[in-house]
Amino acid sequence: MSSYSTRQVGAANTLDYKVYIEKDGKLVSPFHDIPLYANEEKTILNMIVEVPRWTNAKLEISKEQKLNPIIQDTKKGKLRFVRNCFPHHGYIHNYGAFPQTWEDPNQSHPETKAKGDNDPLDVCEIGEKVATVGEVKQVKVLGVMALLDEGETDWKVIVIDVNDPLAPKLNDIEDVETHLPGLLRATNEWFRIYKIPDGKPENQFAFSGECKNKKYAEEVIGECAEAWEKLIKGESVDSKGIDLTNTTLSSTPSYSDAAAQEIPSASPAPAAPIDKSIDKWFFISGAH
């Protein structure tokens, strides 16, 4: 198994913060270079953690920057944080993405009737350990929810770290309710309400909020992997400004072994303090 590590540039909670991913000491793109499958035969997938559970900073893989570092999202030049919707604190799960997947905004999904959100596929890891930013976890797929976020299909794949003590008992979505009662309902609620404190309407779900099973989730992952394959080969209708630079896929047009030389060396700094207002709890009527 390859060993992944992170290269931190700047301090967390600042505009300069970037977390690059290295594989065996070589810089790679978490979007394009890390394989989707850690073990295809056993259906074990790689997941990149963007946001550890119970934290608020809205971190995400940058689609536009070379080698796609994890950065904090901004709005009007200000750092974005997810607010605390009672009784939750920050993100409800370890949150991240599947590499080598793309929710194609040029395509409508036949069942959700909405186009992709132009991101790698979102993943919620429900194990007991709080992850770290840029950690590459090996996970098994359990199911998927279809959020309709401002008119776009935004799949949320539910997974568990293969090393979690509960992993052997969780093999499909119904096992989650058996062993982690209330988790799926709380996850649905959190995604429904988490933007309300920012003055946005509650999010809607396809399938009446139902979490689809493992088989359905694997079909969604397959579709998004195919869409990424077209994207990286330069065959997509519109690549939407995504930086496709990679350091391992030598047969693709955007392969560049030299790209790593343009990336700053590690300069980790202690995290900057977060404004105390981010600690506030928001009470939302209709939430349970």
Curated annotation (Swiss-Prot):
User: Is Endoplasmic reticulum given among the entry's keywords?
Assistant: no
Q: What is this protein called?
A: Inorganic pyrophosphatase
Instruction: Mark out the compositionally biased spans (Low complexity).
Output: 258-271
Report the cofactors. Answer: Mg(2+)
Per UniProt, Mg(2+) 1 binds at D117, D122, D154
Catalyses: diphosphate + H2O = 2 phosphate + H(+)
**Protein's cellular compartments:** Cytoplasm
Gene (name only): IPP1
